């Protein structure tokens, strides 16, 4: 297939590699091959948003942020129910906040997948979001909501005829979408390996990111206005920055140097010793240069308080090479005595944040996290995740 024609219309909702075990498609490749000035993704989660925005900015493309929700009649009831997969697209920053809140809420009702019900979804249907439905039985829930559209994608002729009928009956516009599970036809084999037999979607209709012409050929009964509408909706989307968490500012009456000096006395370390003095000076200068002081204050405070209530691991990973960590009671290993390198922990040439691994008893871990929430606020504490990839090292 000609690369130039793959993205011949603005796609509002493309699935990417971040629809884990459901779809395949590397973000960088999808964006690189996009020929329009806008592009939307809608995965089962928001994991790819930050990378998506960065890649779009590099390629001068307007990013459109969406999320695909599994919607049922009663999310609290943990039973298998008819599921409608609906896409919510943010028109502005408030729309992003709506999606974040709904995404978090849906995790509370996880049953094979994160789910929400129609009533909860309606609470967030305002002028800040666009809602697409690829199914039609529950359209009555959204009558009167002006940003609600029926989504037409390559499926059976009977299904497409029904979409047309519902559109005319309820006066709901149709928007053409590419219901993809991988980018190109030749990617089908990789998709099947990545998602596995259990999650594989098998159908005879188009599963790759289709061109406008492929969609028209597959959906002859869908009006031309459905293709123009995707471009019109893209124009309604504002350009905005994703919200960023505010770094915690630690309230301290002393400096890191003063804390290290006080701790050195307790640990019987002579800071007049040139080896220790030079190492401490070098570490503190780099920590200050990279603006990591608050991070060390927070971790030290957390570990010292935890040690009063539980066993805390002595050190693990590269942080054991830091004299500052040792003097702040974060670790219990003297890096100079054991000839450990600080540069494995923080290096002037590295842009990544320092990573301090701390071991708490399994049964006490949640209490440590709760103390952080109590100290700094619920909105300032979050878990991080790691994305595993099927690739050689």
Give residue spans per PLM region:
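Conserved catalytic core of nucleotide polymerization and phosphodiester-bond processing enzymes
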Residues: 63
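Active-site metal-binding loops of divalent metal-dependent hydrolases
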Residues: 14, 44, 67-69, 180
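Conserved phosphate/anionic-ligand binding catalytic regions in large, soluble enzymes, centered on
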Residues: 95, 175, 180-183, 306, ...
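Conserved active-site carboxylates
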Residues: 1-39, 72-149, 182, 186-302, ...
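Active-site-adjacent beta->alpha loops and helix N-cap segments on the catalytic face
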Residues: 45-55, 157-162
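Ser/Thr-glycine-rich phosphate-binding loops at phosphate-binding pockets of nucleotides
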Residues: 16, 38-45, 316-320
